[in-house]
Amino acid sequence: MALLSIEHLSKSFTLHRVGRRIQGCDDVSFSIQPGEFVGITGRSGSGKSTILRCIWRTNLPEAGRILYDSERFGLVDLCTATQRQMLYLRAYELGYVSQFLSALPRQTAYEIVLKSALEAFGVDDRARAEAETERMLRHFDLDEELWELYPRTFSGGEKLRLNIAAAMIKRPRLLLLDEPTASLDDASKLKVRELIEQLKERLR
């Protein structure tokens, strides 16, 4: 069974100031098998981010289905899943990484990843959360001297690796990467993919 199946997905947006509708995506269908890397390509504005936001449910589609094979709920349509189901899936089964770092202004790199670890393993298992935080930071080549710094001082590549470390520490079954490497050179993009591949193999 596919991990994710998208069937005839459509989403449009209304620009109220100009009274016009624009099509985010139209009649999109594809599936993803467990363990697969799938890339969505297209020019800017073609709907790549719209599709991912529909999966993450920050955008609600107007047509189609997004069928996800959940460990807890079985086959669930993310378009009609309850808010409680979506909160659980985002916490334990789905991960989302954008090109922008989502963190409080005065959170250190270590605190950002630790927060995700505590959500995954529970506040009562802080020792495990701290150990996993250190392991994940090291895996994504974030030097120990960076751990207590604020990410606003980081390079684009360092911010991206931190973002992915925070998402991957929860060991999501499905990780959505919304153009996170857009500002990186080809060598950095390849490095990020290699790190994710290595971690995926280790967590099997």
Which positions does each model-derived feature cover?
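Conserved ABC ATPase "signature" region
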Residues: 127-145
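ABC ATPase C-loop
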Residues: 167-168
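Catalytic Walker B motif of ABC-type/P-loop ATPase nucleotide-binding domains
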Residues: 175-178
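Conserved catalytic motifs of ABC-family nucleotide-binding domains
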Residues: 171
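Q-loop/switch helix immediately C-terminal to the Walker
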Residues: 100, 107-119
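Conserved ABC ATPase signature
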Residues: 150-154, 158
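Helix-to-loop junction immediately C-terminal to a conserved catalytic motif
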Residues: 56
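ABC ATPase NBD Q-loop/coupling interface
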Residues: 65-88
